Curated annotation (Swiss-Prot):
GO CC annotation terms, alphabetical: cytosol
NCBIfam families hit by this protein: GTPase_YsxC
Chain's role: Necessary for normal cell division and for the maintenance of normal septation.
Domain EngB-type G: residue ranges: 24-205
Gene name of this polypeptide: engB
Name of protein: Probable GTP-binding protein EngB
Transmembrane segments: none
HAMAP family per the UniProt record, alphabetical: GTPase_EngB
Binding residues for Mg(2+): S39, T61
Cofactor(s) demanded: Mg(2+)
Binding site for GTP: 32-39, 59-63, 86-89, 153-156, 184-186
Keyword Metal-binding: yes
Gene3D superfamilies: P-loop containing nucleotide triphosphate hydrolases
Pfam family of the protein (one): MMR_HSR1
Length: 216
């Protein structure tokens, strides 16, 4: 049964750990190449067009952006709460090396130290085989010990006859099991319910993997 979104709102932008939202609300982070469609995905998941600003300019997100979402896993259930964190996109060449290094350090600090982080959604463009940056990102996320969910976006840009092969290519390149990558299209609404089911499962999983090095 589809998740029902009760409310969603932008919380804040942060660049340093002291600025991160406080509290115990479970969090899921979203990461992918610049212009892969993160903002469109967040707007589709939160059922609020324009909540996350969509830009035609790659590399626009230069800080962590947090959004609070209340949802019901079933119509009769009490609302539950989850927080989404939009991470800066990777692979954008038109920024300085210094700026890219700053983004990388900011993201690494977040992934390593954020206690309430339950999983990371890695977003890849289904129209193309995963890039070296995508493969490296998947390996890096696994090395942190975080749970990784993969979504193949922009499926609407592909003919339906090519979608299955595109999904298999994503799963093969990222060493995923068959059916592990969620096909997604913000335009068609494809994959919204399937991805929400995995998000809700991760958000309520108290046994989610701890980050590598936690407790050391």
């Amino acid at each position: 049964m589809p998740v029902q979104v009760v409310s969603s709102e932008f919380v804040k932008t942060a660049t340093r750990p002291p600025e991160w939202p406080r509290g115990q609300t479970p969090e899921l982070a979203f990461v992918g190449r610049s212009n892969v469609g993160k903002s469109s995905m967040l707007n589709a998941l939160t059922r609020k067009k324009g909540l996350a600003r969509v830009s035609a300019t790659p590399g626009r997100t230069r800080a962590l952006q947090f959004f609070d979402v209340a949802y019901r896993p079933t119509p009769a259930a009490r609302p539950r709460h989850v927080r989404f964190c939009d991470l800066p996109g990777y692979g954008y060449a038109k920024v300085s090396r210094e700026e890219r290094d700053r983004w990388a350090a900011m993201i690494e600090d977040y992934l390593r130290d954020r206690d309430v982080l339950r999983a990371v959604v890695l977003i890849v463009d289904a129209r193309h085989a995963p890039s070296d940056s995508d493969v490296d990102a998947a390996a890096f996320l696994r090395a942190t010990g975080r749970r990784v969910l993969v979504a193949a976006t922009k499926m609407d840009k592909l003919p339906k006859t090519r979608r299955g092969a595109a999904l298999r290519a994503v799963e093969g390149a990222l060493a995923l099991a068959k059916g592990e990558a969620v096909p997604f299209s913000a335009v068609e609404g494809t994959g919204t319910d399937a991805l929400w089911a995995r998000i809700a499962s991760a958000a309520t999983d108290e046994g989610a993997p701890a980050p590598a090095g936690a407790g050391a």
